[in-house]
Amino acid sequence: MVLCFPLLLLLLVLWGPVCLLHAWPKHLTRAHWFEIQHIQPSPLQCNRAMSGINNYTQHCKHQNTFLHDSFQNVAAVCDLLSIICKNRQHNCHQSSKPVNMTDCRLTSGKYPQCRYSAAGLYKFFIVACDPPQKSDPPYKLVPVHLDSIL
């Protein structure tokens, strides 16, 4: 039993930073955080677009993809057939057509001086969807995670 406590403590210390990378600001719903991170109907330059995300998290996010479409159109993907997500959950949905998107990747800097490169893409995407929370738009399901780009 004495040996278990140090191992548990080590696990918690190592797991803490991983959890922070996937956490969202608690005053936002997961759908609203998804919208902030991934919905950008009109393309913006990556340095500018990413500063909005980084200001919430107080660090330079290493990579982010912006879908150049409306939240309504992306939420409509949630009505399509469910598929298995990367995490083995069954709440993912693939877009029926490709969309324009921008992939932003951190090239240098420390928060708040984060610098990004941009790559324009035209691809399909997969989103994880959940039932909406009270302050979310009134759809049956709303996107909460960008699972992959195809």
UniProtKB/Swiss-Prot annotation:
SUPFAM superfamilies: RNase A-like. It comes from the Eukaryota. InterPro entries: RNaseA, RNaseA-like_dom_sf, RNaseA_AS, RNaseA_domain. Coiled coil: none annotated. It is found in: Secreted; Lysosome; Cytoplasmic granule. Glycans are attached at residues 55, 100. Residues 1-23 form the signal peptide. The record marks 59 as: Facilitates cleavage of polynucleotide substrates. The record marks 61 as: Critical for catalytic activity. Keywords: Antibiotic, Antimicrobial, Disulfide bond, Endonuclease, Glycoprotein, Hydrolase, Lysosome, Nuclease, Secreted, Signal. Its EC number is 3.1.27.-. GO terms for cellular component: extracellular space; lysosome. Disulfide bonds join 46-104, 60-114, 78-129, 85-92. Belongs to the pancreatic ribonuclease family. Interacts (via N-terminus) with bacterial lipopolysaccharide (LPS). Ribonuclease which shows a preference for the pyrimidines uridine and cytosine. Has potent antibacterial activity against a range of Gram-positive and Gram-negative bacteria, including P.aeruginosa, A.baumanii, M.luteus, S.aureus, E.faecalis, E.faecium, S.saprophyticus and E.coli. Causes loss of bacterial membrane integrity, and also promotes agglutination of Gram-negative bacteria. Probably contributes to urinary tract sterility. Bactericidal activity is independent of RNase activity. This is Ribonuclease K6. The gene is RNASE6.
